[in-house]
Amino acid sequence: AVLRVPGAGIRPYNGMIAEAEDGLITLEIGIHGVPVTMDLVIYNNLLYGGLNQYQYMNWDNRDEIYFKRVYIGCVRAADYIFSMDEFDGENLIVYGGSQGGALAIVTAALDPRIKGLVSFYPALCDLNGYVHGRAGGWPHLFRNSTESPEILKQKTKNTPYYDVVNFARKIKVPGFYYLGYNDMTCPPTSMYSAYNTITAPKVLEIMEEAGHFSYPELWPKAKAWIYTHLQVNQ
């Protein structure tokens, strides 16, 4: 089975249809607690309304940070797959890019049932980077900080609980990772800060000229890695 976790934003999803046709159980989730098959206008209303800039919400309160529910929700998605009679009860890989790349690492770190992960250009790495004079990962907290010293201190105290670097340390399963050296959304230095802490078996694909995107030839490599680890014929 493959659990696909989403990149940033608020939008509908179509599911991993080709992989499902190959016989995999696939589950693609959103993170905002709303159905993922509604009209686009509904998501746009949320994007520019109540969920506008959700990635910056409540960093001054450790237990109210938006991503707390998101991280827990990813594990609950794995629970759902494990509840399915069709699932073999063992072979589950989590996959995502950007925010989803972060969530893939987080989910694999939190849930020992997951057997592997695929993470493209993960976000949420080295969140306090800008405080120390280097580029932090998306969502670029503190890049143009106007917080008072007291609020800044509180926020930088809370971020390690959500920093992907601290989840990457706990990875114990094989992973397929990808980054580009011209990525301004998730700077490669921030991604390396997570990648370098991973001691589990890992494959790294680098496309030096790439920004925050991947070339078409990357997905077949990642897909082949997934199918090999799930013992699925292509």
Model regions and ranges:
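Short beta-strand/loop motif that positions the catalytic acidic residue
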Residues: K170-I171, Y177-L179, D183
